[in-house]
Amino acid sequence: MKIYAVLLCLLLIAVPVSPEKLTGPDKAPVTCCFHVLKLKIPLRVLKSYERINNIQCPMEAVVFQTKQGMSLCVDPTQKWVSEYMEILDQKSQILQP
């Protein structure tokens, strides 16, 4: 039951911190974050991440993908974010053949 409460809170908070698709000069879609989530996300709900550092975006960010398919923008300078990225990298290396 706790996990559902956490996910509901994340969903309500994620609306303003989910990545936006913009169109670049070559008409290719560009993912940008305009706001970042301030609270720590439980590692157990995360599946993967993507770094956002496109020059067309207003801020550098990391987008975490949850196991439920949500995308959440977070501040890459926070210590827990870099720790989670390392853990997710290790998990993905173990899963690759």
Swiss-Prot record:
Signal peptide span: 1-23
SMART domains from the UniProt entry: SCY
GO biological process, one term: inflammatory response
Keyword line: Chemotaxis, Cytokine, Disulfide bond, Heparin-binding, Inflammatory response, Secreted, Signal
Domain of life where this protein originates: Eukaryota
Pfam family, one: IL8
Compartments, record wording: Secreted
A cellular-component GO term for this protein: extracellular space
Protein family membership: Belongs to the intercrine beta (chemokine CC) family.
Quaternary state and interactors: Monomer or homodimer; in equilibrium.
Chain's role: Chemotactic factor that attracts monocytes. This protein can bind heparin.
Protein name, as recorded: C-C motif chemokine 8
Gene that this sequence comes from: Ccl8
